[in-house]
């Protein structure tokens, strides 16, 4: 199992490849706000663990294992964003909240959250009822 840090890299690499068609060390460093040397070190570890194939100065490609994991991680992130939006979390907090919880939930929990999201997507009246339950509370300091 990849560590939370490895998951962040795999997710970002997958996302870059999906949007740009490639992922360079410099692109990954820019996206994750880390030094290129940190990316190189992690990419070498991900290569060793067979999530990707890395050749110095030539770039990297995800293996089928890495592609499958990257897709699942990106879907997990999007699902958690949807869930937090459905339950009424302030949009300005959603990204940060997802980053804070995504590595601490089991895949079983993620699947159950997916069921809840799907339920509300398929039952707009239930979603209206949930939204009606939301109360305005003063913002709490974090």
UniProtKB/Swiss-Prot annotation:
Subcellular location: Cytoplasm
GO BP annotations, alphabetical order: intracellular manganese ion homeostasis
GO cellular component annotations of the record: cytoplasm
Regulation: DNA binding is strongly activated by Mn(2+).
Annotated keywords: Activator, Cytoplasm, DNA-binding, Manganese, Metal-binding, Repressor, Transcription, Transcription regulation
Gene Ontology terms, MF aspect: DNA binding; DNA-binding transcription factor activity; manganese ion binding; protein dimerization activity
SUPFAM superfamilies: Iron-dependent repressor protein, dimerization domain, Winged helix' DNA-binding domain
The keyword DNA-binding appears for this protein: yes
Residues bound to Mn(2+) 2: 11, 77, 99, 102
Domain HTH dtxR-type: start-end pairs: 1-63
UniProt key word Phosphoprotein: no
Binding site for Mn(2+) 1: 8, 99, 102-103
SMART domains per the UniProt record, alphabetical: HTH_DTXR
InterPro entries on file: DtxR_MntR_Metal-Reg, Fe_dep_repressor, Fe_dep_repressor_sf, HTH_DTXR, HTH_tscrpt_reg_MntR, Iron_dep_repressor, WH-like_DNA-bd_sf, WH_DNA-bd_sf
Primary subcellular site in the record, as a coarse category: cytoplasm
HAMAP family: HTH_MntR (MF_00732)
Family from the record: Belongs to the DtxR/MntR family.
Subunit structure: Homodimer.
UniProt cross-references to PANTHER family, sorted A to Z: IRON (METAL) DEPENDENT REPRESSOR, DTXR FAMILY (PTHR33238), TRANSCRIPTIONAL REGULATOR MNTR (PTHR33238:SF11)
Function: Central regulator of manganese homeostasis.
Name assigned to this protein: HTH-type transcriptional regulator MntR
Gene giving rise to this polypeptide: mntR
């Amino acid at each position: 199992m990849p560590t939370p840090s490895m998951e962040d890299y795999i997710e970002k690499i997958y996302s870059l490849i999906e949007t740009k068609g490639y992922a360079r060390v410099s692109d990954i460093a820019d996206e994750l706000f880390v030094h290129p040397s940190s990316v190189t070190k992690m990419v070498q570890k991900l290569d060793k663990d067979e999530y990707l194939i890395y050749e110095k100065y030539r770039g990297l490609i995800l293996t089928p294992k890495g592609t499958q994991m990257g897709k699942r991680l990106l879907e997990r992130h999007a699902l958690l964003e949807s869930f937090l939006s459905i339950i009424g979390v302030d949009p300005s907090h959603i990204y940060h909240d997802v980053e804070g919880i995504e590595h601490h939930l089991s895949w079983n929990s993620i699947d159950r959250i997916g069921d809840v999201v799907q339920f509300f997507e398929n039952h707009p009246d239930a979603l209206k009822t949930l939204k009606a339950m939301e109360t305005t509370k003063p913002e709490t300091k974090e």
